[in-house]
């Protein structure tokens, strides 16, 4: 097993879009109406300096990054294939490491997650994100999404 993280390349967006978890595909469409390749490319371009790919045996199994709102606030995102959590402990350790690095740069991270995406919600809670409210009609499909955040000084 060779599981590691590197800076993303544009082609990672297309490669990952073919194997994305069904929950991520559903969340992408519900929030934006976009297909996986469009959403990944947009996320990559919006967070290029803070965009990373998770690799497993030479294949992209996940991408994540931070879209910067301003010098204090960022929007974290992560999309992955079913293989992303194949090695749960390694994935969790890397998640904490990169989250701590992001928290060194931003005072607040926030975003929204589809209420149906229970695996992502559990993962976010395990990383210390707080869920503030349920938005009953969010995004393109007007589905329920949770707002979540993590603040440096709370």
Annotate each predicted stretch with a short phrase.
Residues 64-72, 135:
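A conserved beta-strand-loop-helix scaffold within acyl/acetyltransferase catalytic domains
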Residues 2-18:
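A short beta-loop-alpha structural element at the N-terminal edge
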Residues 137-154:
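C-terminal "cap" of GNAT-fold acetyltransferases
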Residues 109-125, 130, 137-140:
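Conserved beta-strand-loop-alpha-helix junction that forms the acyl-donor binding cleft
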Residues 72-85, 90, 146:
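Conserved acetyl-CoA binding element of GNAT-fold acetyltransferases
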């Amino acid at each position: 097993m060779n599981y590691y993280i590197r800076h993303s390349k544009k082609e990672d967006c297309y490669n990952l879009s073919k194997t994305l978890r069904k929950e991520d595909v559903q969340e992408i469409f519900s929030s934006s109406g976009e297909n996986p390749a469009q959403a990944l490319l947009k996320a990559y371009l919006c967070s290029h300096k803070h965009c990373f790919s998770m690799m497993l045996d030479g294949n992209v199994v996940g991408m994540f990054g931070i879209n910067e709102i301003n010098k204090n606030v960022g929007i974290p995102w992560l999309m992955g294939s079913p293989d992303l959590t194949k090695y749960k402990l390694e994935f969790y350790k890397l998640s904490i490491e990169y989250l701590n690095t992001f928290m060194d740069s931003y005072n607040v991270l926030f975003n929204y997650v589809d209420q149906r995406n229970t695996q992502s919600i559990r993962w976010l809670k395990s990383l210390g994100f707080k869920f503030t409210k349920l938005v009953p009609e969010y995004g393109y499909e007007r589905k329920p999404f949770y707002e979540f955040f993590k603040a440096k000084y709370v």
